[in-house]
């Protein structure tokens, strides 16, 4: 059975394909913050969906805080509408194009872990409890980083697609606790039992045929 997970943060990039006047946007839209002496981009905070967006002068946008790709699309569409009201050269995006750059999720192995033993067993695990209470597992394929905790909880980062997240969690689970053996069903057990009971009967029949 696949490991259950919860997406807690999805980061994506997009482009509004227009030059933005960040000063003008910050003055006109209440939920935009712009402090160029501290950071070159403006910050747009949406309440629904609850997503934060970095806006840059060249029209590039970085979204974070979403829990699904649907929320990313909704946020970019909503942002383009807000900005279009102030700067008409920015088109309202009906079809939203974006690239997922990072996907962060939590999962649970539902068993306690011996992190010292895990670090000894696996070369790609780092564990320095005096610096951080969790162990760091790095997977090459797919390229993901996981934080492992003693209570079996994990935080996974680095996936760019949900399919890669699922694959990475499966790989991590098999590395840490091993592959689970397939359970034998009641029907299979009955077949095995029937097969073993038939063999002696056939042997008796052959013996009976040979005897005078």
Role assignments for model-derived ranges:
Residues 1-145, 151-153, 159-212:
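Intrinsically disordered, low-complexity polar/charged tails and linkers
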